[in-house]
């Protein structure tokens, strides 16, 4: 079984590309059913956020990568975007190292941001719910979560965390002098939407309107605030008219706010959705300011220097954690092989022993039977090693011969 991952992220792909290849907003159960239906795909975990879409897989044949790319390409709306031009393939320990760094926030656009760990955990939970995760992949994710917890407790990588949501609010503040007199509309009440809401409330705007598909979730977030209200997405036309700042963090398949939905009133639009929820053409209107996820980079750069030292400490913890994981996996593999070896030996011995005992009970010469039993066991036990040594010799694999000699305590110098 091999461990691989296929990824499209912000480092190689701009927002319009990431939007095309995003798997968020699709039926999760359908995604898992379809990917597990591919021959040689054994287990899978699908992660899709605003900055990346990654698929972690246990496979039985590396040639299946082409089939997985075809599967992924099938969800792309614009055929001009070819996944082979953008994806990154990782294998083996590289997958585990990347996932550890990702969960610790070291691969994020905002170095050290904590939200990604929750997103990785959510993806893991959905995979389990859809019976898509196996023992090996489960052990990988459990070690990843333990590593992230240790990094958070032993470093200050998350100290005064600066998230994409926080950076978005920073951009809004730069564009509006007196935010206390402004009305803010947040579209989406998911994890990022809730984080946006918290940051916005700290700025004490005149009014915060939170719109979501299910109003109960929005009501739960806004209920403790006098200047906040919860709304259905269907109320967007009325809410847009009131809003000075519109921030979107929602999973949609098409734009939910376009130029025809807004008038001449100056507004700040910030879209951190993938795929994009606010039409980028809104920024072409003279009175508007428009930001997408990629525009947040400049704000994030200001924060990176502060976290580089803590990042190096986190890297050391991750390397140590990976070493621990690999050692444990070696033990699991060897213990499994040893158990299988003993079971094989038991099977060989039990059958011959029963036959020999039956002959002795029938009055046959016990000494002769025991000698014959020992000879048969010797032949059976050594059969596969002898075949293996002959095959290794034919192929010129002296390394295999040396290894097998060591296994049986033979002289490796001869």
Swiss-Prot record:
Please name the PROSITE patterns in this protein's record. Answer: GLUTR
What InterPro entries does the entry give? 4pyrrol_synth_GluRdtase (IPR000343), 4pyrrol_synth_GluRdtase_dimer (IPR015896), 4pyrrol_synth_GluRdtase_N (IPR015895), GluRdtase_CS (IPR018214), GluRdtase_dimer_dom_sf (IPR036453), GluRdtase_N_sf (IPR036343), NAD(P)-bd_dom_sf (IPR036291), Shikm_DH/Glu-tRNA_Rdtase (IPR006151)
Q: Which reaction does it catalyse?
A: (S)-4-amino-5-oxopentanoate + tRNA(Glu) + NADP(+) = L-glutamyl-tRNA(Glu) + NADPH + H(+)
Residues involved in NADP(+) binding = 188-193
User: Which annotated residues bind substrate?
Assistant: 49-52, 108, 113-115, 119
- Identify which residues the record assigns to the active site: 50
Q: Give the record's keywords alphabetically.
A: NADP, Oxidoreductase, Porphyrin biosynthesis
What's the superkingdom here?
Bacteria
* GO molecular function (one): NADP binding
Q: Which NCBIfam families match?
A: hemA, PRK13940.1
Quote the HAMAP family the UniProt record gives: Glu_tRNA_reductase
Per the record, what about its domains? Answer: Possesses an unusual extended V-shaped dimeric structure with each monomer consisting of three distinct domains arranged along a curved 'spinal' alpha-helix. The N-terminal catalytic domain specifically recognizes the glutamate moiety of the substrate. The second domain is the NADPH-binding domain, and the third C-terminal domain is responsible for dimerization.
Subunit-level organization: Homodimer.
The record's misc note reads: During catalysis, the active site Cys acts as a nucleophile attacking the alpha-carbonyl group of tRNA-bound glutamate with the formation of a thioester intermediate between enzyme and glutamate, and the concomitant release of tRNA(Glu). The thioester intermediate is finally reduced by direct hydride transfer from NADPH, to form the product GSA.
Q: What is this protein called?
A: Glutamyl-tRNA reductase
